[in-house]
Amino acid sequence: IINTVPLEDQKFYLQWNLIDAAASFLSDDFVAQNFDFYSRTMSGKKEMQPRWKRAVSTVDGSLGEVVGQMYVEKYFPAAAKERMVALVKNLQSSLGERIKALEWMSEPTKVKALEKLATFHVKIGYPDTWKDYSTLEIKNDSYWANMERANEWSHAEMIAKAGKPVDKDEWLMTPQTVNAYYNPTTNEICFPAGILQYPFFDMNADDAFNYGAIGVVIGHEMTHGFDDQGRQYDKDGNLKDWWTAEDAKNFDERAQVMVNFFDSIEVAPGVYANGRMTLGENIADHGGLQVSYQAFKKATAANPLPVLDGLTPEQRFFLAYAGVWANDIRPEEVLNRTKSDVHSLGEWRVNGALPQIGAWYEAFNVTEKDPMFLPVEKRVSIW
């Protein structure tokens, strides 16, 4: 491209990219145009967030761990972390039991899978060491100038890591982030303090709720270590094939069932989900449900939970999961996410995942007459 595109065109392209990146931090005209295209046209948003929310978002993005430290001190009790540690251990044990019981996987591959599971690096709440921002200069001269300095500081921090051992204690998300992640190159799972709140987690709720909500999230991230991408990395985070050829073939055949199912989902008139693009996340949702449900039943076996508001513990488990993904989404955003997001739409993370789970049929007495019923031979069975 560099040799074929005229130099002036390359200059214009770089100038446009700079303005595009800076637009939301410049004068009102730039901000309005940026919103009109990216938010109104692409996502269907009707109005811009108030200035104070946009400013808070900027500080959160540039000084994430400063904000995170304040958030943790105010909103993250030690008891929440302790409960999460117990949940993670139970989920890890459950996934291990499921791997051992797999009929389609050989013993040599199982041994490698269990080794990888046992060496998960678990991060909960917040990092042990906070970032030092003392060299980042913030002035009253210009909003965009502050952003430039923050970007330069972040870039310098990244470059300084070159040639040094990987710091496995570094976090890739801030504590206040409402999310979680699995990183295959470090074989780590991370659950920031921000996700440990309703509707994902409730210190006052029973195990039916917490295993159905945050428990499935934990299982989801663990399963990422064994999805179509994660399974290609070994326990040390190296891109290395540790599967027998037959086991890899079995995995691919089972994963294709998932692809075919989601490919058949019509998310809007004439628009279908992309089963291949969303495969890793769909496998993780499926595995998360299976692993967390098994851990939930084991944790409550000695002291069964009562029926509450006419709902059994098993029903409340699945309702808690559904509540996590309940949302109101604009038609424009449905199209946008279907084309660009590796996650299935919230509706289908529920209605596409639950018909694959045998325990869901038992909990709600789902029969062939019900619209979400899926014959056993058509259900996904991986982890």
Residue spans for each PLM region:
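Intrinsically disordered, low-complexity linker/terminal regions across diverse proteins
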Residues: Q49, K53-V56, D60-W383
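Noncatalytic, helix-rich "gating/capping" subdomain that lines the substrate-entry/channel surface
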Residues: I1-A86, N90
